[in-house]
From Swiss-Prot:
Subcellular location: Nucleus
Induction: Induced by biotic elicitors (e.g. fungal chitin oligosaccharide). Accumulates in response to M.oryzae.
Segments carrying motif Nuclear localization signal: 222-229
Function summary: Transcription repressor. Interacts specifically with the W box (5'-(T)TGAC[CT]-3'), a frequently occurring elicitor-responsive cis-acting element. Regulates, probably indirectly, the activation of defense-related genes during defense response. Modulates plant innate immunity against X.oryzae pv. oryzae (Xoo). Negatively regulates the basal defense responses to the compatible fungus M.oryzae.
Residue ranges: DNA binding: 245-311
Protein species of origin: Oryza sativa subsp. japonica
Domain of life where this protein originates: Eukaryota
Region annotation (Disordered) ranges: 157-178, 306-335
Entry protein name: WRKY transcription factor WRKY28
Disulfide bonds: none
Length: 396
């Protein structure tokens, strides 16, 4: 009979006895619960295993059921009571904060977009202004160059006119071509008119495609305005004349110089071309032709307006034919008379102190004017020949 173990004490030990063997868990274990244990197998030499008491089995059950061995997944986390005790934020406050932040972000983006648009527009306006200033500077330089070229062309035209008057008359067709060229040059040499400036300013703020069309239209409008401004004033005068008179002279109080004659298609009578004797200072021209309907009527067409006063009648010079007939009573040419009168007025205004210098200048200018006048040469030759014939002794 097995030896009985002494009864256990009333207190439950804190740890199991050393003789209790708990095998490790195996893959195919031999126990299925915490209360099923087996003792180590006894060897033939070892004494038989002791008999387990029911109190130890209760001890093992209580030891295994301790809370420290719990398999709860919430180990170390705050309890539900503590989490529920914290005050939760109101839902209304959270919604308002989210909505206000979104609204503020939208306003900031709109302001940034507006600032970017304004900066781009300022850049475009700055570039346009710079382009307008550059074009204005370029046009100003071109105007200055054209004005200087026009002045030089006027001087050359005066010299060429004087040489032409000495060498002979020029055909009217060439004269008309030259006058048309001079009008074109004057149209190009004039400063830009206000419509052209306004059109250029409007084209500066247009798109590139519109700018080309606007510039072409502005150039055409400016050219049309310039041609209208440069177009001389035209007036006509009808004078009764003798049909047998072929001189085509219309006395209107001014001195004229004939530089050509031509027969037109619509009129069998020739047309005479005259220029004011003060040319090139005075741009007035005159065309005289008999009327195709009435041979007793002379039609005088004036182009331009005189920029000087009408000379007195007693200073009016005669033509070359009249000078040949009345050489001893030949008056000075109109240009020389005008120079003489101007110098006399200046000398009278300056006083006796400058009278000697004025007379010297007057003599030089009169000599230069008379030598350039072909009528003076013819009159001088006629006068000298007539005087020689008068002074020559007769055969009687």
């Amino acid at each position: 009979m097995a030896k009985m173990l002494p009864p256990p004490s009333q207190s439950v030990p804190s740890r199991p006895p050393s003789w209790l063997y708990i095998p490790p868990r195996r893959r195919h274990g031999t126990f299925t619960s915490s209360c099923a244990f087996r003792l180590s197998p006894s060897s033939p030499s070892s004494p038989p295993p002791p008999v387990l008491d029911f109190q130890y089995i209760q001890f093992m059950d209580s030891w295994i059921e301790q809370t420290s061995l719990s398999l709860d997944l919430n180990v170390g986390l705050p309890s539900t009571a503590r989490r529920s005790s914290a005050p939760a934020a109101p839902i209304k406050v959270l919604v308002e904060e989210n909505f206000l932040s979104f609204k503020k972000d939208h306003e900031v983006e709109a302001l940034e977009a507006e600032l970017r648009r304004a900066s781009e527009e300022n850049k475009k306006l700055t570039e346009m202004l710079r382009a307008v200033v550059a074009k204005y500077t370029e046009l100003q330089g071109q105007v200055n160059d054209m004005m200087s070229a026009a002045a030089a062309a006027a001087v050359n035209a005066g010299n060429h006119q004087s040489s032409t008057s000495e060498g002979g008359s020029v055909s009217p067709s060439r004269k008309r071509i030259r006058s048309v060229d001079s009008l074109d040059d004057a149209a190009h040499h004039r400063k830009p008119s206000p419509p052209f400036v306004a059109a250029a300013a409007a084209a500066a703020y247009a798109s590139p495609d519109q700018m080309e069309c606007t510039s072409a239209a502005a150039a055409a409008a400016a050219k049309r305005v310039v041609r209208e401004d440069c177009k001389p004033k035209v007036s006509k005068r009808f004078v009764h004349a003798d049909p047998s008179d072929l001189s085509l002279v219309v006395k209107d109080g001014y001195q004229w110089r004939k530089y050509g004659q031509k027969v037109t298609k619509d009129n069998p009578c020739p047309r005479a071309y005259f220029r004011c004797s003060f040319a090139p200072a005075c741009p007035v021209k005159k065309k005289v032709q008999r009327s195709a309907d009435d041979n007793t009527v002379l039609v005088a067409t004036y182009e331009g307006e005189h920029n000087h006063a009408q000379p007195p009648h007693h200073d009016a010079g005669s033509k070359t034919a009249a000078a040949a007939k009345h050489s001893q009573h030949q008056p000075p040419p109109s240009a020389a008379a005008a120079v003489v009168r101007q110098q006399q007025e200046q000398a009278a205004a300056a006083g006796p102190s400058t009278e000697v210098a004025a007379r010297k200048n007057l003599a030089e200018q009169m000599a230069a004017t008379l030598t350039r006048d072909p009528g003076f040469k013819a009159a001088l030759v006629t006068a000298l020949s007539g005087r020689i014939l008068e002074l020559s002794p007769t055969k009687n």
